[in-house]
């Protein structure tokens, strides 16, 4: 049976969020304090190791089974000229993923991640959200379920990413509705549109917000009206990972925006998440502040497709390597520490 077979099932999952293992956190902190280094000298690497311990429920977490899940979908509003590329590029890039030729293929391989690409009805774009809800209830639940289906017990880490021409416009709409602010504060160049393209994006988001102004302010309604299938897929994967206590690495603006309507209502939804990076999309840093996430990397990336999150896995692996591999003071014969 689908994890999100009904709206009630989705709402129940959002209301019943497991928490990290407090005993594992305590044990991991104790181990950090015993390692042959001054306390705090490895900075955020120490925090990452403790974070991973809490969600894996062990003092010495590992990443033996890591997965990158990339969701793809198309959007009806692209008819308004919001992207530098046609919608056909979404399917072309999915083909490139399958052929092993994309950045995420290289980066997932380098990070030791199993790559899964989930194409969601690419030949059936969402409705134009300036005149209708992007998805009906059934479509949104199906996309959420597709996200949940890629998350399996036994995974040690999940990376989420997306591909969908025009979806930075949907992300801007989700953020503006969830956190306020003008569309101009959230809309950026995306795949590289010029000032005229950004103006078109702002206008489209303004029209969408106006059309849906009287809609219920619930996570599901905001997601189905202003999101997209790949965006709902990311949300479903993150929510299922939480149920299974699997830590998640979020990618850029769009992946994080998938959580905006959920986090605006239930801020704790991001407790099991790390922000892999801060992208060059202007709205991303503002969104990360709302989500309460501090990015691991900031390299000026704006590709999407899980690329920044996959790259950040190397930092997480380094955190676990030091946490698990360093000698303790007792093992090294250092009596009084440093």
Swiss-Prot record:
GO biological process, one term: cobalamin biosynthetic process
Pathway the protein takes part in: Nucleoside biosynthesis; alpha-ribazole biosynthesis; alpha-ribazole from 5,6-dimethylbenzimidazole: step 1/2
Gene3D superfamilies (UniProt xref): 1.10.1610.10, 3.40.50.10210
UniProt GO molecular function: nicotinate-nucleotide-dimethylbenzimidazole phosphoribosyltransferase activity
Alphabetized UniProt keyword annotations: Cobalamin biosynthesis, Glycosyltransferase, Transferase
PANTHER family in alphabetical order: NICOTINATE-NUCLEOTIDE--DIMETHYLBENZIMIDAZOLE PHOSPHORIBOSYLTRANSFERASE
Family affiliation: Belongs to the CobT family.
Protein name according to UniProt: Nicotinate-nucleotide--dimethylbenzimidazole phosphoribosyltransferase
Source species: Novosphingobium aromaticivorans (strain ATCC 700278 / DSM 12444 / CCUG 56034 / CIP 105152 / NBRC 16084 / F199)
């Amino acid at each position: 049976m689908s994890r999100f077979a009904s709206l009630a099932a989705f709402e129940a999952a959002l209301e019943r969020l497991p928490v990290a293992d407090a005993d594992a956190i305590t044990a991991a902190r104790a181990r950090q304090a015993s390692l042959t280094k001054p306390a705090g000298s490895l900075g955020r690497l120490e925090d990452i190791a403790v974070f991973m311990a809490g969600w894996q429920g062990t003092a010495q977490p590992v990443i033996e089974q890591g997965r990158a899940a990339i969701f793809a979908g198309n959007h009806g509003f692209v008819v308004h000229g919001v992207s530098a590329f046609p919608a056909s590029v979404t399917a072309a890039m999915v083909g490139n993923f399958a052929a092993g030729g994309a950045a995420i293929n290289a980066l997932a391989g380098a990070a030791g991640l199993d790559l899964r690409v989930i194409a969601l009805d690419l030949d059936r774009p969402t409705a134009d959200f300036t005149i209708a809800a992007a998805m009906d209830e059934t479509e949104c639940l199906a996309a959420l379920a597709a996200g949940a289906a890629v998350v399996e017990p036994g995974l040690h880490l999940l990376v989420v990413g997306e591909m969908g021409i025009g979806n930075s416009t949907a992300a801007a709409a989700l953020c503006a509705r969830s956190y306020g602010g003008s569309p101009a504060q959230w809309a950026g160049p995306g795949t590289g549109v010029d000032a005229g393209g950004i103006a078109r994006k702002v206008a489209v988001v303004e029209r969408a917000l106006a059309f849906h102004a009287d809609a219920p302010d619930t996570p599901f309604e905001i997601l189905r009206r202003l999101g997209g299938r790949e965006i709902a897929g990311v949300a479903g994967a993150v929510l299922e990972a939480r149920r299974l206590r699997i830590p998640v690495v979020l990618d850029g603006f769009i992946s994080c925006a998938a959580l905006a309507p959920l986090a605006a209502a239930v801020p704790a939804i991001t407790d099991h998440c790390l922000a892999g990076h801060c992208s060059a999309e202007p709205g991303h840093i503002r969104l990360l502040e709302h989500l309460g996430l501090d990015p691991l990397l900031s390299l000026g990336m704006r590709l999407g497709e899980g690329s920044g999150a996959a790259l950040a896995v190397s930092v997480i692996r380094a955190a676990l390597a030091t946490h698990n591999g360093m000698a303790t003071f007792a093992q090294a014969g250092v009596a009084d520490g440093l």
